[in-house]
Amino acid sequence: MEHLGAHHLHQGQAEPISFGIDQILNTSEPGSCMVSHPRLQDSADYGLGCIVGSAYNTVTGGYGASGGGAGAYGGTSCSMGALPGSYNVNMAVSMNGNALSSAGGVIRVPAHRPVAGGVHQPLSAAVPPVNGMNSLTGLTFPWMESNRRYTKDRFTGHPYQNRTPPKKKKPRTSFTRLQICELEKRFHRQKYLASAERAALAKALKMTDAQVKTWFQNRRTKWRRQTAEEREAERQQANRILMQLQQEAFQKTINQPIQADPICVHNSSLFALQNLQPWSDDSTKITSVTTVASACE
């Protein structure tokens, strides 16, 4: 029993916890944040501390119970110090016992911001300029650098204005009638020229070697096309003539009179086989065959 009583007495005399939520929210020092937890103390060595008067300072006269009362968000702010290998970002956390703490440790947040006197103050007039805000404009991140690296200059104006102009075509070389006549004569005699012959012809006609070579290449292409067209026309003409001759020969065989074979004249069956022919409207031939057969009998 004495041991149990001593144990209860020891528990009753235990010191209160110094890092509870109530102690943190109800701190009496307006410009400091309590860091009593061992892990929080260790994190302070890495640059996590509370800095008063950082870049993000809340405006006095903010959320309050009455319009003319003191601001609920004070000037106390906690910021993250510079960590090695981390971004330089300031995070402001405003604290006030009247606004953030209540009975039972429940945080109450007003539904709207009451304005004193019913007059809306402009944001620029309510927020004083802070030197720390100017330092935030110089923040750079790795993704910003990559975007700047791959950005392309955009040109203003019509979309077709900045296109590369098309290449100018070379003017077509024009030859004189005398040059063309001499080239045609030489082409009819010789379709291909050697390098020495081409140089001599170019010198005689006062032309360059490249001009003579190009002219002969174009002329050979034209000659091949004309030759192919002429051959095709000749082939079609020959086919038409052949079909016409076949039709005429067929008509002659049909209209040619049948000569009676002297051997078959006296035999009616052989004579009938000899005179087999397609059906025709000519009744005179049929009558002649019947008369000849009757005569043979």
UniProtKB/Swiss-Prot annotation:
Any one GO BP annotation for this protein: regulation of transcription by RNA polymerase II
Residue range(s) of DNA binding per entry: 168-227
GO annotations of cellular component type: nucleus
MF-aspect GO terms: DNA binding; DNA-binding transcription factor activity, RNA polymerase II-specific
Origin species: Gallus gallus
Gene3D superfamilies for this protein: Homeodomain-like (1.10.10.60)
Keywords: Developmental protein, DNA-binding, Homeobox, Nucleus
InterPro entries cross-referenced by the UniProt entry: HD, HD_metazoa, Homeobox_CS, Homeodomain-like_sf, TLX1/2/3
Protein name per its UniProtKB record: T-cell leukemia homeobox protein 1
The organism's taxonomic lineage, starting at the top: Eukaryota, Metazoa, Chordata, Craniata, Vertebrata
Record region (Disordered): 153-174
Coiled coil region boundaries: none
Subcellular location: Nucleus
Function comment: Seems to be involved in the development of cranial sensory innervation from peripheral ganglia.
Main location (coarse class): nucleus
